[in-house]
Amino acid sequence: MKKHLLPLALLLSGISPAQALDVGDISSFMNSDSSTLSKTIKNSTDSGRLINIRLERLSSPLDDGQVIAMDKPDELLLTPASLLLPAQASEVIRFFYKGPADEKERYYRIVWFDQALSDAQRDNANRSAVATASARIGTILVVAPRQANYHFQYANGSLTNTGNATLRILAYGPCLKAANGKECKENYYLMPGKSRRFTRVDTADNKGRVALWQGDKFIPVK
């Protein structure tokens, strides 16, 4: 598939990906029965970092998603939005959803601006911390509908999400092609209205298994 759900945008200037701030999972999910979510970020480098965080609502988490207006200014809040993170330190960032309690799934981009700090001599008597390298990291937050309807259809190795909330789907068992080995596994996120065919696992085999997650609930399909 050309379009992948939940892409990561990592634009760097003067810093390599290995040195960038560790923001955890590329994609995060806030289930329908929760209005808060926490993400732990870590500075694994040997210098302090200045972190600024911004939120954008997206029409879709796919490659063609566009930034759109939020339904209200305080739809999604976070704290802290700016912090100084010492070397080898961690911090918990908390997100709070205060938007409409309807049947619509919402997508947000969390933009992390990460700047490394070092001491720079301004004059003989004064030293100050200045940014010496920077990175812009984008991750995705999916807020499930407050009124979630989980429905799906499965036939001939293909799953269709007929509900209104993204599903995490998986298949495991004998490989469809011998070249891939004996046992294979596939994991995908399936948005509402989308279908996905498993291409590595032989789901027609009696030992082939298909399952999915509806929020925190595990559902065997085959």
UniProtKB/Swiss-Prot annotation:
It comes from Escherichia coli O7:K1 (strain IAI39 / ExPEC). Residues 1-20 form the signal peptide. Part of the ecpRABCDE operon, which encodes the E.coli common pilus (ECP). ECP is found in both commensal and pathogenic strains and plays a dual role in early-stage biofilm development and host cell recognition. Induction: Negatively regulated by H-NS. Positively regulated by IHF and EcpR. InterPro entries: EcpB_C, Ig-like_fold, PapD-like_sf. Keywords: Chaperone, Fimbrium biogenesis, Signal. This is Probable fimbrial chaperone EcpB. Belongs to the EcpB/EcpE family. Gene3D superfamilies: Immunoglobulins. SUPFAM superfamilies: PapD-like. It comes from the Bacteria.
